Amino acid sequence: MARDVDNKQNAKRISRDEDEDEFAGESMVGRTLDNPFLGEDEFEDIFGSESQYISSSGQNSTNPFLADTRIENSPLGSESKANQLNKQGTNVNHIEIPLRDFNDPTQPESFLPPPKNTFTSRIKKIKNLFKKEKKQVKPEDLGPRQIILNDYSANHFLHNAVSTCKYSAFTFLPKFLKEQFSKYANLFFLFTAVVQQIPGITPVNRYTTIGPMLIVLSVSGIKEIMEDIKRKKQDQELNESPCYVLQGTGFVEKQWKDVVVGDIVKIVSETFFPADLVLLSSSEPEGLCYIETANLDGETNLKIKQALPETAGLLKPVELGQLSGEVKSEQPNNNLYTFDATLKLLPSDRELPLSPDQLLLRGAQLRNTPWVYGIVVFTGHESKLMKNTTETPIKRTSVEKQVNSQILFLLCIFVFLCFASSLGALIHRSVYGSALSYVKYTSNRAGMFFKGLLTFWILYSNLVPISLFVTFELVRYIQAQLISSDLDMYNEETDTPAACRTSSLVEELGQVGYIFSDKTGTLTRNQMEFRQCTIAGVAYADVIPEDRQFTSEDLDSDMYIYDFDTLKENLKHSENASLIHQFLLVLSICHTVIPEYDESTNSIKYQASSPDEGALVKGAASIGYKFLARKPHLVTVSIFGKDESYELLHICEFNSTRKRMSIVFRCPDGKIRLYVKGADTVIMERLASDNPYLQTTIHHLEDYATVGLRTLCIAMREVPEDEYQRWSTVFETAASSLVDRAQKLMDAAEEIEKDLILLGATAIEDRLQDGVPDTISTLQTAGIKIWVLTGDRQETAINIGMSCKLIDEDMGLVIVNEETKEATAESVMAKLSSIYRNEATTGNVESMALVIDGVSLTYALDFSLERRFFELASLCRAVICCRVSPLQKALIVKMVKRNTGEVLLAIGDGANDVPMIQAAHVGVGISGMEGLQAVRSSDFSISQFCYLKKLLLVHGSWCYQRLSKLILYSFYKNIALYMTQFWYAFCNAFSGQVIFESWSISLYNVLFTVLPPVVIGIFDQFVSAGQLFQYPQLYQLGQRSEFFNLKRFWSWITNGFYHSLLLFLCSIAVFYYDGPNKDGLASGHWVWGTTLYAAILATVLGKAALISNHWTQYTVIATLGSFLLWIVFMPIYAVAAPAIGFSKEYYGIIPHLYGNLKFWASLLVLPTIALMRDFVWKYSSRMYYPEEYHYVQEIQKYNVTDYRPRIVGFHKAIRKIRQMQRMRKQRGYAFSQGEEDQSRILDAYDTTHTRGAYGEMR
């Protein structure tokens, strides 16, 4: 019953179609349905009746969610398929929606809600009139796919090679050019380069713009190609993975890319499926096999698949090679957990139905099964996993977007200057035209104005620094290499370095406000270990904390913990020895684990679909209760070397509603006993009135919960024979019922699960990745909000949240776990009201953590509730979303993206994390044990979560600060030089005359000032890495955009204007009374212009030195070296250029320049005057208005000892006291047993039989 309810609720999931252009900031966004099986009643449950939708004219309009949504239009095409989906059990109940966001071209537009009647929507409608509609072909319209067995020539389908590359040989140029010319600056330079080719317009050489622009585009293109080559290599590594394919009567090794539809492949344990397969047979009884789908849905427990009975006996390659027949399947689609197909084996005409029970998805891993045979049905990009991936998105950083917007404002100033200069030329002509008859002005004033406009456009075009973009890309690439070569983020154990796959996002790492993290494989190792237990009120552990070790001074205290050796002694001599025996017996026989003898190691290997059960069985075996063998109705266990067999009578299965599993055994002494394990809440409700160890056990459970251990309560009762016989009849009747069987079985279990005796509880550790608690704590201190999105259950998620310190003892838990939309809305609103009431009463908001499950999240993401849900989530320091599907992970990220302007980072290690990683501004992949799908789709990859701390706090902060300074400095230095052209226009009758020689203007950016921004962008450190770790609060400078914002940008622009005007006026003053030189000639225009050029160069290089925080030899080379380069270059160029006819402006200038005292005095005095204001400003701001990092710079400079370690002990003591006072209701229950048909597993295996010649279990 609960399972059916869960499926129905999850069938109502909806998704968003994000349109950032039209709907950004609006509360209503487009939606489409992720599940094709919704009827009209279900639509009304979610969206209300049709009458709620009113057209703009005031008339009732058709509900857009009901149009064209008949079952026959669904991807599967029949109502029976919806029913079949609900029969699959809860292994699909929370992941039935596909991974991809629903910008699905196959869905009718009528799914979308009515758009607002805005100007934007009208424009879009007009554009749509001129668009040529493409007819979209739906998969169901193509008919079934026909696959012929063992006839490769008859099957012509897509190859199995996959690619995650951004470009191909054909798409590189159009895609790259589209991306580059989406930047306003590049469009501006393109237009300028075109105008510059018009004869008689340009005042400078016609190639001074197009040349640098081609260099910029070339460098950017080379960088993109190199990064895409890396992606191609990773794709190649996957495509060349080995697998075994049937050829004739034997299997040969082939590469994944060579697998084709119709192949029969052999997959061995611990390997991934290379394509979507139909299971034919396996080494296990009745064609069973275990698969791990953590790479797909994040679930830690194993799933069970079963071959058809007609094919389960095909164990020999010869038999497989003789197969003839066909598979008719649905066309490739993105529905992961539905599959409709039939198998016909000749000579029979019977068509055998295939379902998801026989479907093995690409990306899943075979576990605890030696081998399986399967038929390939979908390959490559037609596999269901790849159908759910989207094209690698093109991401742009916040800084880049700000630069783009500020360039627009700068262009407005530029256009104003052009118009002002052109207008000035007309005014000057009107006033002085008659006195300047030799100029020969044209009579066409309008033509003169527009010609002047284009001339000044070219003359002032360098106000926007073209070199910025090539420098920007170059520095980004080098920063990416520094990240990839950081040995602190190198995992020696797995030989895995960090990798930057998208260098264009490095500065985004310094502004992250939210982190969305997967749990399994990212925060945890998914390795369960039996750590502690409490039996009859006594606590035991494998490792005992120092403050809890037993002393003889207080024998009766329940504060102490004993080791497992003491547990073994108490089995022999304690008065509670019988309870200890029964406790360990439950661990060793009450489970679905399959034992298998390993001849190579002469030991037993346990195959467990639940990692929790595996840990408990191994824990019991380590104490002396070793599980040996299983038959369909018999379990054998060795107790300290003595074998005992227990007859399994009935099993009451575990599910998420019952939260417990119970098995009825007939024990060797002839008595019937019921053994139960489950959550503390459900076990304690069913205890007998006399349980002396209840309170002590509760106290121990709370202790386990505070350290993040996963707990289960263990209980039992003896069942009288007559009671058992009566109950057995009730249970068998319920098991054979055709109507509401699940509820009747649960009711039957309730009748016998009563008057239990509490034996104790277990505590299992889900091992965290190294350094996870410290990393999370540090990142939270840095002001980053962390959301954990996991497919696991609520209890498991809370448990991990505690152990990894995402949830600490100071936090209150806000839990939203509802079944309907109305209940979810009420819960969210009630919790918001409570928080605001508390704030009004106490004056502050308590530190809280929000926990929400997948069903509630479906409704919380609805547009009517989204804002309120985000408001609640934003008030919480941490958020845990459990039982979420891959698509929901992406929708959560997009929801936060719509409601906040902060940078979002998503981190995960499985294919189920790919939508989330692609939806976030920054995607980080963990190169772990769940494959490399997440890594291939990510922007950065690391091998452990703990490396995220340095990636963000150090590399992120440095990259953001460095690139911000690089951008600001690049704009400043261009304005400082090129604005002098505008000031000079007032002195030359707005004629368009230039101050500087043409190629000197171009070389200013390309040669003489290129090194300072590069060196600053690569080597500058506003504080050291150690200080960034010690003071993670400094990371908030990036979150607040302190280093690059509107105020700071325009202060630099203003400073550039100031320096250009000051130096221009001072240079005029220096040469105003210029007398003749030794040769009797005046210095002239080019001497004055070159002196001004050198003074500006010295000033901007001095400015670079002034803003450098971290001096290296490269800083000296970039500043002093660049100026010395100009001093050496100038005489060589002035002699060589006129001699070869390249440029004649500098002919004969060197004697007048280098022999002129005014020139050398100007190089010393003018930059000093210009930079004096900057020096005074820097001194006063640091002394009287210091920022946070200024204090840290002083601490770093003078090596001041940090005072904070002195109070660490005090804080630890306070936390320990709070731990003792809190979490009295949360007792750490968590259990990852899959809700499979557990009886089927127990009935299928007889492990006393040996395996056959092909490894099959007979």
Swiss-Prot record:
Q: Which Gene3D superfamilies match?
A: Calcium-transporting ATPase, cytoplasmic domain N, Calcium-transporting ATPase, cytoplasmic transduction domain A, HAD superfamily/HAD-like
Residues that bind Mg(2+): D518, T520, D909, D913
Q: Which residues lie on this side of the membrane: Cytoplasmic?
A: 1-183, 230-406, 473-974, 1020-1051, 1108-1115, 1170-1258
Compositional bias per record (Polar residues), positions renumbered to this chain: 53-64
Catalysis performed (reactions): ATP + H2O + phospholipidSide 1 = ADP + phosphate + phospholipidSide 2; a 1,2-diacyl-sn-glycero-3-phospho-L-serine(out) + ATP + H2O = a 1,2-diacyl-sn-glycero-3-phospho-L-serine(in) + ADP + phosphate + H(+); a 1,2-diacyl-sn-glycero-3-phosphoethanolamine(out) + ATP + H2O = a 1,2-diacyl-sn-glycero-3-phosphoethanolamine(in) + ADP + phosphate + H(+)
Q: Which UniProt keywords apply?
A: ATP-binding, Endoplasmic reticulum, Golgi apparatus, Lipid-binding, Magnesium, Membrane, Metal-binding, Nucleotide-binding, Phosphoprotein, Translocase, Transmembrane, Transmembrane helix
Any one GO molecular function term: ATP binding
* Cellular-component GO terms for this entry: endoplasmic reticulum; endoplasmic reticulum membrane; plasma membrane; trans-Golgi network
Q: Which residues bind a 1,2-diacyl-sn-glycero-3-phospho-(1D-myo-inositol 4-phosphate)?
A: K1103, R1173, W1177, K1178, Y1189, H1190
Q: Where is the active site?
A: D518
- Its recorded name reads Phospholipid-transporting ATPase C887.12
The lineage is:
Eukaryota, Fungi, Dikarya, Ascomycota, Taphrinomycotina
